[in-house]
Amino acid sequence: MDELTPRQSEILAWIRARMAEDSLPPTRAELMRAFDFRSPNAAESHLRVLARKGYILLQSGTARGIRLCASEEETGLPLIGRVAAGQPMLAEEFREGQLPVDPKLFSPGADYLLRVQGMSMRDAGILDGDILAVRHDASLTLQDGQMVVARVNGEVTVKRWKRDGKQVWLLPENPDFSPISVDLQRDSLTIEGVVVGLLRIGGNL
């Protein structure tokens, strides 16, 4: 790979650190703010140089489309600590490690793995302790019935998505649990990803 300038090395080190900390690639806007670039185009220009020199890959059509090249990253997918799949809990995300799972095993490809806690998605075949493969892509248009990882007022839960205008319902797959009602004009809602697969350690995929 071509040698980097000090500035390019600084940007690459920042990208690595962000991905290690958050387990997700940074956005162009985050890069722009971190380095006080005057425009997104300046951030994009630096990213394209890193890509041309073989340090990163750029995926079009997504805000978090930065990927470290194979020689720059660990193999597999990062495993994020337990997430509520029952009543939502205050999520303090942490990285448990890296699992040797090919992202391309799933369609669309997964960005990270997330451990489930609780039985609210039992009837969808998701049990306590299972590991979900999650695609984090802000450009995806959610369809009713899709399974999502949602952060509601700071708390994380795994549920099925249903929307009617400004009203969202996060639906469990277990009659012992109640739907979560979200008013988009009042509540804070962030979609942390769409579930694209299931892993059960010691069992079948």
UniProtKB/Swiss-Prot annotation:
GO terms for biological process: DNA repair; DNA replication; negative regulation of DNA-templated transcription; proteolysis; SOS response. Its EC number is 3.4.21.88. The record marks 85-86 as: Cleavage. PANTHER family: LEXA REPRESSOR, LEXA REPRESSOR-RELATED. Represses a number of genes involved in the response to DNA damage (SOS response), including recA and lexA. In the presence of single-stranded DNA, RecA interacts with LexA causing an autocatalytic cleavage which disrupts the DNA-binding part of LexA, leading to derepression of the SOS regulon and eventually DNA repair. NCBIfam families: lexA. This is LexA repressor. The gene is lexA.
